[in-house]
A protein has these predicted regions:
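A conserved short helix/loop substructure at the end of the activation segment
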Residues: 159-168
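Catalytic-loop of the protein kinase fold
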Residues: 39-55
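Conserved activation segment of eukaryotic-like protein kinases, specifically the C-terminal portion
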Residues: 78-93
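Activation segment of protein kinase catalytic domains, centered on the conserved DFG
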Residues: 14-29
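Conserved catalytic-loop aspartate of Hanks-type protein kinases
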Residues: 104
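Conserved short submotifs of the Hanks-type protein kinase catalytic core
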Residues: 2-8
């Protein structure tokens, strides 16, 4: 097991926001490549948020795989348990639908938002039932100004209300 000398993504958010775009995109590419590797093995993370370790020099590693389950688990199970940190949980999961690969993509959109804001999504609100309802009605974090349009468009696609419209 590798030691994460630079802590977690969450503990480095303020530094990440200050990074040049090329570094942010390199880090996000590293994260989505790790998630793709999990998905290629037909697993769903189910608790994807700032639990990403910064091993060294922009080499990131997804951690906290304790709730990770095979895709088939949700296809054959009536399990409607909700795992994770509220703003990172996809709206369809909050409505009782099973986790899917696209649920993790929704979570990735919140990580994208953290990279440009430096704070947790909805950091100034209680993580409660009302926020769950609001997310299910389409509430998303406020778009930060002066962010490249292509980045915003991708982030919005990843947090689309319809999981079938999210990139995979």
């Amino acid at each position: 097991m590798k030691y994460a000398k630079n802590n977690s993504l969450r503990k480095n958010l303020l530094n990440i926001v200050k990074n040049r775009w090329i570094i942010k995109l390199l880090q996000l590419t590293n994260i989505i490549s790790g998630l793709d590797e999990i998905h290629q093995k037909r697993f769903i993370h189910c608790d994807f948020h700032g639990n990403i370790l910064n091993l060294r020099d922009n080499i990131l590693s997804i951690s906290d795989l304790g709730l990770c389950k095979p895709v088939e688990y949700f296809q054959s199970s009536k399990n409607n348990d909700i795992y994770g940190v509220l703003p990172f949980v996809a709206p369809e999961v909050l409505r009782g639908q099973p986790y899917t690969l696209t649920s993790d993509i929704y979570s990735f959109s919140m990580i994208m938002w953290e990279f440009i804001s430096g704070v947790l999504p909805f950091y100034n609100e209680a993580y409660d039932f009302q926020l769950s309802l609001d997310i299910c009605k389409g509430k998303r974090p406020e778009i930060i100004k002066n962010i490249p349009r292509c980045y915003i468009n991708l982030m919005k696609r990843c947090w689309d209300m319809n999981p079938l419209k999210r990139p995979t």
